Amino acid sequence: MKKNFLSVLLIFTTVFAFAQTPCNNGEAGGYECNGYDLMAHIPLSVFNTTGANDSWGWTDPDDGKEYVLMGLENGTAFIDISDPVNPIYLGKLPTATGTTVWRDIKTYNNYAFIVSEASGHGMQIFDLTHLRNVNNPPVTFTEDAHYSGFSDAHNIVINENTGYAYAVGTNTFGGGAHFVNIQDPLNPVAAGGFSADGNTHDAQVVTYIGPDADYAGSEIYIGSNGSGQIISIVDVTNKSNPQGISTLSYSNSGYTHQGWFTEDHRFFLLGDEFDESNVGFNTRTIVFDLTDLDNPVLSYEYFGVTPAIDHNGYVKGDNYYLSNYAAGLRVLDISDIENDNIVEIGFFDTYQDNNDASYNGVWNVYPYFESENIMINDRSGGFFLVRSSLLNNNDFSAVNTFVVYPNPASDELTIKSNGDVISSISIVDVVGKVLFAESDLNSEIKNIDISSFSAGIYFVNINNNLTKKVIKK
């Protein structure tokens, strides 16, 4: 579907192109949305760059202030978002060597670790406490330390529990994991690597708490191995002797790009970057059941509502936050993933031209700020900060005005008003089928018989304004 694009919005050269625009009637500041408000936007021109890529976040432990670490083609930008409606661009750490499309950032304690595919870049180390007192921003920062154990890298992963970084896609270990001890951040030390499963494009490393008792407390590396079209699961507890556990493949593979564990480490959600364009189906998220790490199995394939390519995705609680290129940020409810139920519950689309299977739009999102603000890094659109409409002040009254109970429910669902009159109610299932709808109610309480509904997730919309998720037992 062709989307309306307000090109006039791009002529702003000030830092704040727009600020706090609620999502009303599917639009916020000229961007299509569902359930997510636009808090702020900074175009790429402000950062003096032509492209953005990866991103991460840091929260200052001293005062709780939140900062965005934004990857650019020519360096890394730092943005203070402690006032989300008025973010402050503090400055940039220039690239260590040349410019490149690819840059990746992670944090450990109060330090940022930055890699790039620029030749000879190595790993930049930056003390984030420099962001506390910046006079006359934006300024140009300098790195505090440098690691030259590899020339360049596609990505970096950090297990903050152990103090180890894992650079992947380097010129070492066949492009597999390159281990670095960063427990003393300004004095990183090479600690070995793993090459048996080939080049890794991206990875996640966790201290394992999942259902496989054989690996309880172990440090588990799960690599998405790009053109190798496999997932590689490795026990990296002993850095001098990492042990391959298993590999797995799947049908219609093109480029095994990136994935993330559910918080209980049972499931792994994977995105393949080429499958949408190669095969022609809608955005596919592949779910693997890793109950037994030695014998992982494909559990479920979820297909989105557009043909856009998926890029990076992250799990936080019951939600999966997906950077979906031309389709923007998509938020999926995975609370019922065990029963093969995944449903999109919201989105914010920063790319206006289309939802095609192209590489335009959102490269990365960062959903882990305690404030619940979500950073979106758009390749050409720049920095966006969004927030769930249910969390913003303008919606608090709606959230508190209506109560939906019991939840979970068995046979009957009650919607009760604590103020506003209930004028309309609709209930839809996870595929959008309307199972109940009434309008012109003008009542303060409504009981609905749901005994015929199948067990699963449903969405109750009240007055075409507030939507609440309910579970039918």
Model-predicted segments: where are they?
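Short, surface-exposed loop/turn motifs with a glycine/proline- and acidic-biased composition
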Residues: 419-420, 439-464
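Residue-level detector of functionally pivotal "anchor" positions at catalytic/ligand-binding pockets or at interdomain
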Residues: 386-405, 411, 418-420, 433
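Feature marking well-ordered beta-strand scaffolds used for ligand recognition
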Residues: 19-391
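Short, glycine-anchored, charge-dense loop/turn motifs used at functional sites
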Residues: 427-435, 458
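Sec-dependent signal peptide recognition
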Residues: 2-11
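C-terminal tail/sorting-segment detector
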Residues: 3, 457-473
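Short coil/turn motif common to extracellular beta-sandwich-like domains
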Residues: 216-218, 407-414
